[in-house]
Amino acid sequence: MRRKADNTGRRPRLGLALSGGAARGLAHVGALKVFDEHGLRFDCVAGTSAGALVGGALASGMPFGEIEKIGRSLRWRDLGRMTVSRLGVQSNAQLEEYVRARFPVSRFEELPTPFAAVATDLRTGAAVVMRDEGDVAFAIRASCAVPGWYVPVTDGRGRQLVDGGLVANLPVSVVRALGAEVVVAIDVNFEGAKFLGPPASVVGVLLQSMLVGQRTAVAHQRQLADVVLSPAVGHMRWDEMGRAAEFIEAGAEAARAAMPAITELLEPQPEEGQGWFNLRRARDRQPLKD
């Protein structure tokens, strides 16, 4: 997409925030496909859980074709293995190995695009934002460690880290902290618990329980974004990795619908008195009353 700019040539720093959502996070891949087709490039990316995996791949400079290939072939067996532990059913160390083997770079310092992954400190309940330095694969693993299913991940400071979705499932404020002036957020859980039937696995039960606790925080983060995409994936469960093609298409449809709004935000609006771009959200543009 051609970005318009004022006579200084400056453009807003564009950020992308990707939510967690287990298999539903594959919808992020479809959105990236449309962004890639339009030549849209992000200056910084933040992701939680599944969003950290997809966002990390994007920030690493991985070609989109490879991201899509991974998204369509990814299975639960790639992410974890059964383990003997009182703290979880599986270890997701395999996910760390998977990422390290496929990403073009392995450390935050080497990423061509600034990136942050969010985890949760199990002892304090605080968000742990991993950025700037350290191991990207480890950060993604920690961000994806669904509590109760995966064993918590212990970092170099002795903190037990679990899925960032507990405290920041849609990390809009995190990508703002990376310097984003315009933020596109993708929330794959907007439709909540609407799906066909009850959870079909322990993972589904755990993820749905997390979603209930996330709703207030996510609603606030949605308000902080300039454009929010909500792919229509509510009829598919969080554990249905085999429906990758449907998740990806849902993400692509949401991105196509959002492209006009994104384009408008990146255009200069001198008549608005804001210089080189218009930050007003479409939902705030109401006709004036007499």
Each language-model region and where it sits:
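Patatin-like phospholipase
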Residues: 1-48, 56-290
